[in-house]
Amino acid sequence: GLSTCSGVIIGMGETAEDLVDVAAELNRLAVDSLPVNFLHPIEGTPLGDRPPPGPADCLRALALFRLTNPRAEIRAAGGRERCLGAAQPLALFAANSLFVEGYLTTPGQRRDAAVEMIDRLGFEVETAAAEMDRRVQV
């Protein structure tokens, strides 16, 4: 009954080779859930002066993790709003899950805005609460 979750933060100084290596290792480990976070530099922290990754780098990373981990739930997570900007909807072509409404250190996209974005793309929203409702009704 347990599932595994292990993720990454894109933009902390890793190379393309580093990303390929971690994507392959997470595949080898058969991780069930793979959150892909994007560096959101915060002033006063060790990486506070580092520029965040751009949209193209973020989308490439999501595509890499999707292609190397086809059975995993790829979760576009922290920093996606800032780093992807207007390209954020494109993340859903590689990711099949979003984190919304707040991360550990930064606010996140509001749930209603995320649902609207998903609807505009023609995707369906599934939530743990909706799944629980279906189980209770059976």
Task: Pin down the residues of each PLM region.
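Active-site glycine- and acidic-residue-rich loops that bind
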Residues: 9-23
